[in-house]
């Protein structure tokens, strides 16, 4: 009983410590999310600029390589930030967190809520599983960025091919009309030359 009373006396201080640690974690998580969103926005802006421009093949290939390198750097930065966010709790705080988990599990059992059970199960996941989840999210973001860039490059290539074909057709029509006009002029000149000797013989 005395141990329980000692725990109850220390809980306000420990809760303040745990709350401070949780607030720091939450602030770090928000900062990393904000930085990740800024990186995603920058990459999407670059992909939009790639969509509007139609560079030659070599320049387009260089830009694709640069954007892939930037996407990989962004992925690495996100993974590094997730590693830095992962911090260890002091032993007293861990004990208090475990006690709170036990209390919440008991409360969930008494209420029988599915959401509470799911939340407590997520809290029980080890840190390496949470880190794996963050890595998967970073990989997925990188995949989406690469997919967007690939679609932009394909759109630009399609537009270039269409324009070349339309230009060739237009030039082909013009060439055909010019040849027809010249041929008609040649025919008229040859006819007029034939008529001139005949007309001179009549005079």
Curated annotation (Swiss-Prot):
<feature type="compositionally biased region" description="Basic and acidic residues">
    <location>
        <begin position="74"/>
        <end position="86"/>
    </location>
</feature>
<feature type="compositionally biased region" description="Basic and acidic residues">
    <location>
        <begin position="96"/>
        <end position="111"/>
    </location>
</feature>
<keyword id="KW-0175">Coiled coil</keyword>
<feature type="compositionally biased region" description="Acidic residues">
    <location>
        <begin position="64"/>
        <end position="73"/>
    </location>
</feature>
<dbReference type="InterPro" id="IPR000048">
    <property type="entry name" value="IQ_motif_EF-hand-BS"/>
</dbReference>
<dbReference type="Pfam" id="PF00612">
    <property type="entry name" value="IQ"/>
</dbReference>
<feature type="region of interest" description="Disordered">
    <location>
        <begin position="1"/>
        <end position="111"/>
    </location>
</feature>
<feature type="compositionally biased region" description="Basic and acidic residues">
    <location>
        <begin position="39"/>
        <end position="51"/>
    </location>
</feature>
<feature type="domain" description="IQ">
    <location>
        <begin position="129"/>
        <end position="158"/>
    </location>
</feature>
<feature type="coiled-coil region">
    <location>
        <begin position="13"/>
        <end position="82"/>
    </location>
</feature>
<feature type="compositionally biased region" description="Basic and acidic residues">
    <location>
        <begin position="1"/>
        <end position="12"/>
    </location>
</feature>
<protein>
    <recommendedName>
        <fullName>IQ domain-containing protein F3</fullName>
    </recommendedName>
</protein>
<feature type="compositionally biased region" description="Acidic residues">
    <location>
        <begin position="29"/>
        <end position="38"/>
    </location>
</feature>
<dbReference type="InterPro" id="IPR039887">
    <property type="entry name" value="IQCF"/>
</dbReference>
């Amino acid at each position: 009983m005395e141990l329980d009373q000692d725990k109850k006396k220390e809980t306000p201080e420990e809760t303040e410590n745990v709350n401070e640690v949780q607030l720091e974690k939450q602030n770090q998580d928000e900062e990393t999310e904000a930085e990740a969103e800024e990186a995603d926005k920058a990459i999407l802006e670059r992909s939009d600029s790639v969509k509007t421009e139609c560079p030659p093949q070599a320049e387009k290939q260089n830009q694709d390589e640069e954007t892939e390198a930037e996407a990989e750097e962004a992925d690495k930065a996100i993974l590094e930030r997730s590693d830095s966010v992962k911090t260890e709790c002091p032993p007293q705080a861990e004990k208090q967190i475990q006690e709170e988990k036990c209390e919440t599990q008991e409360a969930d059992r008494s209420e029988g809520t599915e959401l509470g059970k799911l939340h407590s199960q997520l809290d029980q996941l080890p840190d390496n599983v949470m880190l794996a989840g963050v890595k998967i999210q970073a990989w997925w973001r990188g995949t989406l960025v690469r997919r967007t860039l690939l679609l932009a490059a394909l759109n630009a290539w399609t537009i270039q091919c269409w324009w070349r074909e339309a230009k060739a057709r237009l030039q082909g029509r013009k060439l055909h009309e010019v040849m027809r006009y010249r041929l008609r002029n040649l025919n008229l000149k040859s006819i007029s030359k034939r008529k001139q000797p005949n007309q001179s013989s009549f005079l």
